[in-house]
Amino acid sequence: MADDVKRVVVWSTGGIGALSIVAVQERPDLELVGVWVHSEEKVGKDAGELANGVPIGITATNDVDALLALEPDCVVYAASGPERDAGAIPDYERLLAAGVSVVTTTSTTLINPMAYVPDHRVRLEAAAAAGGASIFASGIEPGFLCDQLPLVFSTACRSVSKVHCYELALYDDYGVEEIMIDALGFGRPLDFEPWIMLPGAIAGEFQGQIRYIADGLGVEVEDIRETYDRRLTDQPIDTALGTVEPGNCGAIRFQAIGVVDGREAIVIDHITRLARHVAPDWPIGEADLSYRVVLEGKPNFECWITPTLDDPAEAGIPTMGSGAGAMLATAMRVVNAIPYVVDAQPGLLRSLEMPLTLPRHAVRAS
């Protein structure tokens, strides 16, 4: 990996984008040269003030040509929205074709390009080849805890019979209606049919992770099964979206299950509640957001992970509760990867073929 300073543009000043701005500014091997914003109200404002209230002398813009003229080596792409890929693919194509590498938290299924939407993959491969650039998607989940980490544990195994990864979360402070209600079905009675109930929705969203693990272990996935269950609350729950009354959905559980040799061998298991009292018979995390990775084999491995952040306000995300540590970890998965992605061969990258994206200049007193 080359030691030269990489020029960076951050795309969006939402939670992940804001954290990325601060992180890039701290790194002597990275130089923040520009920031893209969607809202006209943010255009012309100091990007540092938008991120965490501290001016940095870089003016936010929505002019892509102006940002490309800055000759960045890489863009940290952190835009969000209900139709993420639909909006992001044209941006990725333009950046890659211009010779700018991309690290992204937006397109979660791109963590495994081999299982990405074929049309999107072909378009991105062509753009990357034309510009001689690379694109890499990551995050904490997906992108690390329930896909890369199990493979790390497997390096100490003689045999592996099953991989089971859990995300155990309390989402009472998450106030995005199109996700919480429309997609997941929280706060609604059982006759409400959210997006996640559509046949193939869960398998489609998580097949990349399952195939990533299978590729790493050298096995073939014969089928991907899916399950979805929900439980009603029997008492009112105060949430960021208002009060959820008794008789409405207060917890959901969904699984994507990879079948290998006729067995359910790889399981991604998400259990999400609005309050800890709902569905007490389901596994409960050690904290409001926890992850559990279980490998059954020789030897067995079980690991609990709870990402936390002592001072979310200092980090620039004062309204975040239990998810603050995970949000920062998501940002750092791509920020730390920047030098490796810029120096990689052109194309669509995944962690399986990359070196560990170890952070440089991260060891300090605080």
Language-model features: locations:
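Alpha-helical support elements that line or immediately flank enzyme active sites
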Residues: 144-155
